[in-house]
């Protein structure tokens, strides 16, 4: 036996309303799932290649998602040897960085000054907006994960620091 609103009779109109909602929401949920394929990259299976030409020699990279040279989402890892340096530069998109291994010393500004950097140790995360002038150096072998919107570009503050234009 019921009492009050807990025993309201479910009318045919209410059935149609609930059924219509289900018919509308199930395809939307399924479509969202279809656009999100899963990808796993166990660390030992990454394919490391020479780093992008915009970085000094010695850098290695592994692309996890997308294509950093094209518009759209990308995720890549960069591996730097001990003492690796990237001189002051900026990007056209916001940069998101996570230190996977080692220590990345990051500084802001137009002059490379080791003493004015912040040590980002394993597990550190940071992001900075497009146009932010910054520089970095690695202490120990360092692996950095970058993700964001492509194309990923680097413009050096001092054109002479750009490895793409450096003379042998």
Please describe what each predicted stretch is.
Residues 23-31:
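Hydrophobic h-region of N-terminal signal peptides that target proteins for export
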Residues 32-74, 117-118, 159-168:
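A short, N-terminal "cap"/entry segment at the start of jelly-roll beta-barrel domains
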């Amino acid at each position: 036996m019921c009492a009050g609103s807990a025993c309201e009779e479910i009318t045919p109109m209410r059935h149609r309303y609930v059924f219509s909602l289900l018919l509308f929401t199930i395809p939307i949920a399924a479509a969202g799932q279809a656009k999100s394929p899963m990808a796993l990259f166990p660390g030992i299976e990454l394919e490391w290649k020479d780093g992008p030409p915009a970085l000094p020699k010695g850098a290695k990279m592994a692309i996890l998602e997308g294509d950093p040279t094209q518009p759209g989402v990308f995720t890549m890892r960069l591996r730097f040897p001990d003492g690796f340096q990237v001189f002051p530069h900026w990007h056209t998109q916001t940069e998101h960085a996570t230190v996977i291994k080692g220590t990345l010393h990051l500084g802001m500004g137009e002059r490379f000054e080791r003493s004015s950097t912040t040590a980002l140790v394993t597990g550190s995360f940071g992001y900075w907006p497009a146009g932010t002038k910054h520089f970095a150096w690695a202490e120990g072998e360092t692996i950095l994960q970058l993700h964001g919107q492509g194309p990923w570009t680097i413009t050096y503050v001092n054109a002479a620091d750009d490895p793409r234009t450096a003379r042998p």
